[in-house]
Design a protein with these regions (language model features):
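Predominantly a Rossmann-like dinucleotide-binding segment in NAD(P)-dependent oxidoreductases
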Residues: 2-5, 10-103, 157
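Beta-strand secondary-structure signal
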Residues: 35, 110-112, 120-124, 137-139
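Glycine-rich phosphate/pyrophosphate-binding beta-alpha loops
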Residues: 75, 101, 124-132
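C-terminal glycine/acidic-rich active-site capping loop/insertion
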Residues: 83, 91, 110, 115, ...
Length: 176
C-alpha cells in the first residue's frame, strides 16, 4: 500500500486556534454558514510544460492522482473548516474544471457543503486566480456573530457581532 501524508499547517496558527476556541465556547451562537476559499494563481498558465517546477507532478494524474487543485489545496480549506467549526462535512455537491487548455486535471473547483448540525458551507479552491499568491480565507457565521481569518494576515482574527462593534484581534502578539 501507498501512504499519503499531508501536513495541515494552517490549523497551527494562534488566530485559528482562537477562532476554534471561541466557536467551541458558543460565542457565535448556533453556527449557520461557512465560507472557505483557497486562491492561488501560479497555475493560471500551463507552466508544467516548462519543467523544473512543482507543476509537473501536481498536474500529472499518474503522479498526483485524479484530484488536481481540489486535492492539492482544497484539502487544506476542507480541513480548516472542519477544524475550526468542530463539525464534519456529511454531504457535498462539487463542480471541478480544468480551465487551462490541455491540462488533464482540475485547476479550479467549488463545492456546496452540508456539515453536521444543519450547518451549510461553500468551499472554493483555485490555482488559476491570476495575480494571487497563496491566499486562504475562512468566514464562519452563527446566529450571534461571525468571524474571519486570512492567511495573508495570519495574526488577525476579525469578529463581527449582531449587537456590538466589530472586533479586530491581533492574536500573534498577545502572549500566544
Amino acid at each position: 500500500g501507498l501512504v499519503l501524508a499531508l501536513t495541515h499547517v494552517y490549523s497551527a496558527y494562534p488566530a485559528v486556534k482562537e477562532a476554534k476556541a471561541r466557536i467551541a465556547k458558543g460565542e457565535l451562537g448556533k453556527l449557520r454558514r461557512v465560507y472557505v476559499e483557497y486562491t492561488q494563481g501560479w497555475l493560471s498558465e500551463r507552466i508544467e510544460l516548462l519543467g523544473g517546477n512543482n507543476a509537473g507532478w501536481r498536474t500529472d494524474p499518474k503522479r498526483s492522482g485524479k484530484a488536481g487543485c481540489i486535492g492539492d489545496i482544497g484539502t487544506h480549506a476542507w480541513h480548516l473548516s472542519e477544524y475550526i467549526t468542530g463539525l464534519k462535512v456529511k454531504e457535498l455537491c462539487a463542480d471541478l474544471k480544468a480551465f487551462v487548455p490541455g491540462r488533464p486535471i482540475d485547476d479550479d473547483g467549488a463545492a456546496f457543503l452540508r456539515y453536521e448540525n444543519d450547518v451549510t458551507g461553500v468551499l472554493t479552491a483555485t490555482q488559476i486566480g491570476t495575480g494571487e499568491a497563496n491566499n486562504i480565507r475562512i468566514r464562519i457565521y452563527g446566529e450571534k456573530g461571525g468571524l474571519e481569518w486570512r492567511q495573508m494576515e495570519p495574526n488577525t482574527l476579525t469578529l463581527r457581532w449582531r449587537d456590538r462593534p466589530t472586533e479586530i484581534l491581533d492574536i500573534g502578539n498577545n502572549g500566544y
